Design a protein with these regions (language model features):
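Membrane-interfacial segments
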Residues: 11-16, 67-68, 92-97, 135, ...
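Membrane-interface loops
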Residues: 18, 56, 60-136
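Alpha-helical transmembrane segments of multi-pass membrane proteins, especially transporters
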Residues: 26, 74-79, 169-170
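Membrane-helix interfacial "entry" motifs
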Residues: 30-41, 63, 67, 71, ...
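Membrane-embedded catalytic cores of phosphoryl/pyrophosphoryl-handling enzymes
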Residues: 101-210
Length: 210
């Protein structure tokens, strides 16, 4: 969160990119070619509408079906809250998009922090927390890390975000998902009533035999 606050302060003082922003943008742009253009323009759509939203919807329905109310509340709160934080930050900070070359997939709203970076990171961070005590956790972490980095790369490759927009989006998303986790505690469950009944029955049998 401190990284996000520091970047936000710099953005308030300087609406353009940071010194290392332009260097990284130009370095990524050097590898630009038609095939990569198509790949990046397609892949970037999975950062929100083609990927994050469908996956979040399916998982929400599964949690609803399983009556995992805390987990469902956690997932929805983190994702919807992430959108609200992103929209608010963009309106308050008014950071313009990079203008180093003509993008094949232009964006016209404000840049800081990156919505795609926030959406992808929020989803993966939330899933890591939800699967923390299961065998799925490492798989989610591994695949999710590749996904998050890939989405971040597409935003830079397409020239629609400064690298600091991406970094800020990641940092605030991690802080947000952890904070909501501490509040909602999605892993907190009530003791199993079935187990309680079994224990009571065992006790009664022990008394009868005694």
């Amino acid at each position: 969160m401190l990284v996000f606050e520091e970047l936000a302060l710099v953005v308030l003082q300087n609406q353009g990119g940071l010194p290392w922003d332009e260097t990284l943008l130009l370095a990524v742009h050097k590898i630009a070619q038609p095939q990569l253009d198509v790949f990046a323009a397609t892949l970037t759509k999975f950062g929100v509408f083609w990927g994050v939203f469908p996956v979040a919807t399916v998982i929400s329905l599964v949690l609803l079906r399983l009556k995992k109310w805390r987990s469902l509340a956690y997932l929805l709160t983190t994702l919807l809250g992430s959108i609200l934080i992103n929209r608010t930050a963009k309106l308050l900070l008014h950071r313009v998009r990079p203008n180093l070359w003509e993008s094949i997939s232009p964006e016209f709203d404000y840049a800081f922090p990156s919505g795609h970076a926030m959406s992808s990171m929020t989803l993966i961070a939330a899933l890591v927390i939800l699967t923390w005590n299961s065998n799925w956790c490492w798989l989610v972490l591994a695949v999710g890390s590749v996904f998050v980095l890939a989405i971040g790369w597409t935003r830079i490759y397409l020239g629609v975000h400064f690298p600091s927009d991406i970094l800020a989006g990641w940092m605030v998303s991690i802080a947000w998902t952890i904070g909501v986790n501490l509040l909602i505690q999605p892993h907190l469950t009530k003791p199993s009533t079935v187990r309680e009944d079994e224990l009571t029955l065992d006790e009664e049998e022990s008394i009868a035999q005694g």
